[in-house]
Amino acid sequence: IADNYYGTFNRLCRENGITFTAQAVGNALCIVSDPIKAKSRVDKPQGEFWPIHPDGNYDIKESSSAAHVYGKNIASAEAYTDAKYSHSIADLKTLADYAYAYGINELVICASAYQPWLDKTPGNTGGGRHYCINRNNTWWDYSTPFWEFQARCAYMMRKGTPSIDLCVYLGENAPVKILTHRLPDIPGGFDFDAFTTDALITRMSSKNNKIHLPNDMSYSMMILPRN
């Protein structure tokens, strides 16, 4: 899937001068594939986060890990999926803070921008979901500083070289995902990237008691899964 599907799309996009982004391979545990390797085959690896999962799980950590391990400057995320009209800008900021802490530096807003009616509110949503980020929201006219702040955060997050303490090998047992019950206990105050066999073979080397990547990143420790 990583090479023949996403790799083929990447090649075709490059041949035509197109930037390729994809939520490779998505969140579903039924997809038997390597998400880190699949995300490495796109220009901008993308995950997603929802308000119902405020700690930033889903696959945004996989997206930032793929960006770090494979030397990509942008780790993208579908942001605020299914945010409700009851969510305030303060709620959205908290969600964005989690995403930035997980290494995301581009927010692709999940919204319902298409609002053809002038006399209907809340207007066009989507498939029974709120998708509240549109001009019919009561705080919309006051939100410009918030979006400018998010743009500035994303810009600053792309500068410099990420400093990550640990790298965690996800193994090869399906599903190859960042699953909390499989992860070792990460000490408080330390951050990690996840990687899989492809990166171990093609991207990593050992020198001076550290694990190095070609893009000048390094890790102080490699952690293996419990299984």
What is the role of each PLM region?
Residues 1-227:
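Carbohydrate-binding surfaces of carbohydrate-active enzymes
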